[in-house]
């Protein structure tokens, strides 16, 4: 009994710490922006219909106008920009891979500086949306809104880091999950239920929701748990001539190795672009017609969304799984990939293997995006809103990832205590 208590104690403490931080983060949603008093009117009349709300929904932000409205969106944008710099400039790559802890701290510092910059940019878009709903608006109001939401976003970034380091799971992902759960009743188009006066239509819509949720659960699990394995043989096995399956090692490459990052990045970029274009006074007429048309907007959104998801699936997987690093580690362990020569051939093989796994993962993520719309067309009901589909995908993926991390932490504790 005592051993079991010692085993579970640290895990329980981490879970408790995580829950308390998430509660604290949710309380921040009720802290208004100084000087913004017409919150309820603005919220009910238009906020839920804006791209800013959708962007906030996908980044752990508030579902009302508060200091946490921007959520973690600016941080995601800054992280993406820094990762591009790491890949494009050798100096940044050296900082991340060769400078050790000091180099990583420098990368984190650059990310935080860019986060502040993106906060300021997005806060001015938010300010433009607020102008017509706030009395006595003046130039100082821009700076008040910018300071308030920038501070709120940076606090969320700090809380996410605390969860990641001292809690359970990925902090930013859990903040997004809690935000999605809190606005679950808003994920479905309001008109969907208002128009369901006929019993048969109501039953069809319930069937649609159930099938959609089950399909998302299945495809999300396949994406997170499915993997391809690279067979690895040690030098000792080669010398002894023993290569049986029982003693063979593998390097697992998950289909969804990039996790929910491709969806978060794709959603953030697309919503930021559409918001920016809509607010341009001299935007091209054809462009504005496309964005203002619901059907065309869905076609444009889905096509661009799928392309971005596929791109970021490949891009981010190659960032977190570098073929060169894997080849170096194999060399250090005196191991080789079966039937592959060490050196350049190994790097090429690993890169090809990772790209194949990423392709399958991107197809699974794309299927998750398309399934709700296909089912809605087949059953003749209104589809889930675009932001609703994305939020559900994120929620399922984050839950799967968090459960896996909890189990991994528990197994690690058991191993350490038994050794």
Swiss-Prot record:
<dbReference type="GO" id="GO:0065002">
    <property type="term" value="P:intracellular protein transmembrane transport"/>
</dbReference>
<feature type="transmembrane region" description="Helical">
    <location>
        <begin position="359"/>
        <end position="379"/>
    </location>
</feature>
<keyword id="KW-0150">Chloroplast</keyword>
<dbReference type="InterPro" id="IPR026593">
    <property type="entry name" value="SecY"/>
</dbReference>
<keyword id="KW-0472">Membrane</keyword>
<protein>
    <recommendedName>
        <fullName>Protein translocase subunit SecY</fullName>
    </recommendedName>
</protein>
<feature type="transmembrane region" description="Helical">
    <location>
        <begin position="202"/>
        <end position="222"/>
    </location>
</feature>
<dbReference type="GO" id="GO:0009535">
    <property type="term" value="C:chloroplast thylakoid membrane"/>
</dbReference>
<feature type="transmembrane region" description="Helical">
    <location>
        <begin position="64"/>
        <end position="84"/>
    </location>
</feature>
<keyword id="KW-1133">Transmembrane helix</keyword>
<comment type="function">
    <text>The central subunit of the protein translocation channel SecYE. Consists of two halves formed by TMs 1-5 and 6-10. These two domains form a lateral gate at the front which open onto the bilayer between TMs 2 and 7, and are clamped together by SecE at the back. The channel is closed by both a pore ring composed of hydrophobic SecY resides and a short helix (helix 2A) on the extracellular side of the membrane which forms a plug.</text>
</comment>
<keyword id="KW-0812">Transmembrane</keyword>
<feature type="transmembrane region" description="Helical">
    <location>
        <begin position="167"/>
        <end position="189"/>
    </location>
</feature>
<feature type="transmembrane region" description="Helical">
    <location>
        <begin position="380"/>
        <end position="400"/>
    </location>
</feature>
<keyword id="KW-0811">Translocation</keyword>
<keyword id="KW-0934">Plastid</keyword>
<dbReference type="InterPro" id="IPR030659">
    <property type="entry name" value="SecY_CS"/>
</dbReference>
<dbReference type="InterPro" id="IPR023201">
    <property type="entry name" value="SecY_dom_sf"/>
</dbReference>
<keyword id="KW-0793">Thylakoid</keyword>
<feature type="transmembrane region" description="Helical">
    <location>
        <begin position="255"/>
        <end position="275"/>
    </location>
</feature>
<dbReference type="Pfam" id="PF00344">
    <property type="entry name" value="SecY"/>
</dbReference>
<feature type="transmembrane region" description="Helical">
    <location>
        <begin position="143"/>
        <end position="163"/>
    </location>
</feature>
<keyword id="KW-0653">Protein transport</keyword>
<dbReference type="InterPro" id="IPR002208">
    <property type="entry name" value="SecY/SEC61-alpha"/>
</dbReference>
<feature type="transmembrane region" description="Helical">
    <location>
        <begin position="113"/>
        <end position="133"/>
    </location>
</feature>
<keyword id="KW-0813">Transport</keyword>
<feature type="transmembrane region" description="Helical">
    <location>
        <begin position="19"/>
        <end position="39"/>
    </location>
</feature>
<dbReference type="GO" id="GO:0006605">
    <property type="term" value="P:protein targeting"/>
</dbReference>
<feature type="transmembrane region" description="Helical">
    <location>
        <begin position="299"/>
        <end position="319"/>
    </location>
</feature>
<comment type="subunit">
    <text>Component of the plastid Sec protein translocase complex, which is composed of at least SecY and SecE.</text>
</comment>
<comment type="similarity">
    <text>Belongs to the SecY/SEC61-alpha family.</text>
</comment>
């Amino acid at each position: 009994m005592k051993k079991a208590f010692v085993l579970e104690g640290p895990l329980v403490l981490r879970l408790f710490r995580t829950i308390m931080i998430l509660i604290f983060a949710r309380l921040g949603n009720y802290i208004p922006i100084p000087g913004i008093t017409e919150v309820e009117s603005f919220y009910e009349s238009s906020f839920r219909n804006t791209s800013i709300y959708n962007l906030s929904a996908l980044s752990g932000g508030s579902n009302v106008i508060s200091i946490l409205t921007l959520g973690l969106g600016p941080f995601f944008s800054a992280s993406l920009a820094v990762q591009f710099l790491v890949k494009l400039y050798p100096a940044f790559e050296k900082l991340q891979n060769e400078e050790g802890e000091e180099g990583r701290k420098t990368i984190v510092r650059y990310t935080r500086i860019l986060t502040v910059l993106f906060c300021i940019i997005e806060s001015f878009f938010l300010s433009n949306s607020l102008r017509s709903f706030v009395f006595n608006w003046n130039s100082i109001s821009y700076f008040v809104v910018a300071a308030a939401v920038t501070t709120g976003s940076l606090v969320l970034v700090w809380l996410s880091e605390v969860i990641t380091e001292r809690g359970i799971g990925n902090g930013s992902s859990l903040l997004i999950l809690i935000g999605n759960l809190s606005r679950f009743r808003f994920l479905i188009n309001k008109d969907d239920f208002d128009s369901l006066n006929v019993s048969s239509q109501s039953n069809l819509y319930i069937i649609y929701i159930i099938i959609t949720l089950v399909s998302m659960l299945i495809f999300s699990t396949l994406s997170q748990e499915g993997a391809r394995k690279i067979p690895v043989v040690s030098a000792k096995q080669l010398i002894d001539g023993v290569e049986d399956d029982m003693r063979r090692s593998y390097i697992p490459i998950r289909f969804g190795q990039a996790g929910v990052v491709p969806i978060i990045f794709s959603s953030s970029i697309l919503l930021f672009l559409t918001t920016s274009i809509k607010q341009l006074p001299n935007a091209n007429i054809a462009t504005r017609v496309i964005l203002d048309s619901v059907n065309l907007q869905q076609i444009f959104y889905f096509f661009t969304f799928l392309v971005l998801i596929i791109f970021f699936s490949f891009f981010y997987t190659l960032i977190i799984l570098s073929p060169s690093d894997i080849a170096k580690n194999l060399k250090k362990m005196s191991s080789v990939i079966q039937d592959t020569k060490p050196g350049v051939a190994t790097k090429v093989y690993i890169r090809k293997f990772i790209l194949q796994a990423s392709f399958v993962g991107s197809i699974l993520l794309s299927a998750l995006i398309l399934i709700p719309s296909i089912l809605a067309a087949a059953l003749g009901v209104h589809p889930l809103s675009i932001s609703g589909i994305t939020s559900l995908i994120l929620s399922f993926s984050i839950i799967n990832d968090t459960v896996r991390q909890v189990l991994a932490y528990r197994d690690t504790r058991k191993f350490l205590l038994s050794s």
